[in-house]
Swiss-Prot record:
UniProtKB keywords: Aminoacyl-tRNA synthetase, ATP-binding, Cytoplasm, Ligase, Nucleotide-binding, Protein biosynthesis
Reactions accelerated catalytically: tRNA(Glu) + L-glutamate + ATP = L-glutamyl-tRNA(Glu) + AMP + diphosphate
Family annotation (PROSITE patterns): AA_TRNA_LIGASE_I
'HIGH' region (motif): residue ranges: 10-20
Binding partners and assembly: Monomer.
Protein name per its UniProtKB record: Glutamate--tRNA ligase 2
Similarity annotation: Belongs to the class-I aminoacyl-tRNA synthetase family. Glutamate--tRNA ligase type 1 subfamily.
């Protein structure tokens, strides 16, 4: 499918949420699949609610996710002159008009119609006024508006259900409904993939496309994401913004895999690489029902990607805000092989690996140290006699068995007496493996520090 151009067009009124991230991913994958372009447009015409902080969060969120856009970012607010130009063109063509009706009057009529169970269809009743007018697009009477959606099929409503559409506010700023049509046309957008909550907007925008003789893009409206309880996603369901997931310790590749599977499927495949996603992605495999968040599935995916990442790459991520000596980095590089299998989050992995950096005795470890102090001292003395060249798993295991026989101490008590002072926690990988990684000097130092 040549010449595909998709876009992601968020409003910078908040952080990049998970629904927006999925929309961006689907548009990016569709463009990648067809050798097309993926553009980024910031829809910042709502001056009161748009913030630079939100713009930065959107850009940073896409960067973290690994979703790259083509060309320069388009800021909708910088195209207002173009929006006004096209609005005036519609007025000249008789497809739009200046409306002087006070906003509060229109709002009251809408409320009254709703209370009466009617559809309010605005017609301007004020030819002139001291107030600055809005520009309204004339919605034709009694016409079927048909959207040929790539997910829902043909969806039809009557134009009688629509009010005349405000396209320019009284301050000459464009409304979302209108600006999007102009911007998408000028950018050559061929395919619009967005949330199903935009379907009502599409009926209105289709009329504007037709009035301007613009080529109509293909539309695909993706069902929304719901919480695990089946209700519309909200903050009470937990993390909703991309930055929340990054802080939790989710890997971007795991997040991409997870977002892809929220509403799209490829047979029974769960673990899907970027290469496979680009090769397989299509609109036909997007379901019509809302996708549900499943944090257990996200944990499973994240554990998979953590487990399969190289120790060097994991260490780089773990140490972004920490400086360690080469010796401690060496401990971590060796220890991560076992630890990463246990972690569902990077933050969790950092906690699991903490004992390689420093020892903080847990309450349980403190109690064991207190109860086994004499055994710990004996072990420190006994292990000091082991040569550094013999400090390996097989030799240490045999020596500890000898120690058990010599002092008539259970092996389980010996392992506890080693684990508590050396790691500070009682739920860690095999203590002999840890001792080999730390080396003789560090182990003796930790045993003697008690």
């Amino acid at each position: 499918m040549p010449g595909i151009v998709t876009r992601f067009a968020p409003s910078p009124t908040g952080f990049l949420h998970i629904g927006g991230a999925r929309t961006a991913l689907f548009n990016w994958l569709y463009a990648q699949r067809h050798g097309g372009q993926f553009l980024l447009r910031i829809e910042d015409t709502d001056r009161k609610r748009s913030t630079q902080e939100a713009i930065d969060a959107i850009i940073d969120g896409l960067k973290w996710l690994g979703i790259s856009y083509d060309g320069e970012i388009v800021y909708q607010s910088k195209r207002i002159d173009r929006h006004i130009e096209v609005a005036n063109l519609l007025v000249e063509k008789g497809r739009a008009y200046h409306c002087y009706c006070p906003e509060n009057e229109v709002a009251e009529k809408k409320i009254r119609a709703r209370e009466e169970g009617k559809i309010y269809k605005h017609k301007c009743t004020h030819s002139t006024s001291n107030a600055e007018p809005v520009v309204r697009f004339k919605v034709p009477d009694s016409e079927d508006i048909v959207v040929d959606d790539k997910i829902y099929g043909q969806v039809t409503i009557s134009s009688d259900q629509l009010d005349d559409i405000v396209i320019l506010r009284s301050d000459n700023t464009p409304t979302y409904i209108f600006a999007v049509v102009v911007d998408d046309h000028d950018a050559g957008i061929t395919d619009i993939i967005r949330g199903s909550d935009h379907l009502t907007n599409t009926f209105k925008q289709l009329l504007i496309y037709q009035a301007l003789d613009f080529d109509v893009p293909r539309f695909a409206h993706v069902p929304l994401i719901h919480g695990e309880d089946g209700n519309k996603l909200s903050k009470r369901h937990g993390a909703t913004s991309v930055c929340d997931y990054e802080k939790m310790g989710i890997l971007p590749q795991a997040m991409r895999n997870y977002l892809l599977r929220l509403g799209w499927s490829h047979g029974n495949d769960e673990i899907i690489s970027d290469e496979q996603a680009i090769e397989w992605f299509n609109l036909e495999s997007i379901g019509r029902s809302p996708a549900r968040l499943d944090f257990k599935k996200l944990e499973h995916l994240n554990n998979h990607y953590i487990s399969n990442m190289s120790n060097e790459d994991i260490l780089t991520l773990m140490l972004r805000e920490n400086t360690l000596t080469d010796k401690k980095k060496g401990y971590l590089l060796q220890g991560l092989t076992e630890l990463k299998k246990r972690a569902n989050y990077l933050t969790e992995l950092l906690d699991l690996a903490k004992f390689y950096i420093q020892v903080d005795l847990s309450e349980e470890a403190q109690q064991i140290v207190k109860s086994n102090l004499n055994v710990i001292k004996l072990l420190a003395s006994f292990l000091s006699s082991v040569g550094s060249e013999d400090w390996n798993k097989n030799f240490l295991s045999s020596q500890i068995k000898e120690f058990s026989k010599l002092h008539n101490i259970k092996m389980s008590d010996i392992y506890h007496s080693l684990r508590a002072p050396i790691t500070g926690i009682m739920d860690a990988p095999g203590i002999i493996d840890i001792m080999v990684i730390l080396g003789k000097d560090e182990c003796i130092k930790r045993l003697q520090a008690i």
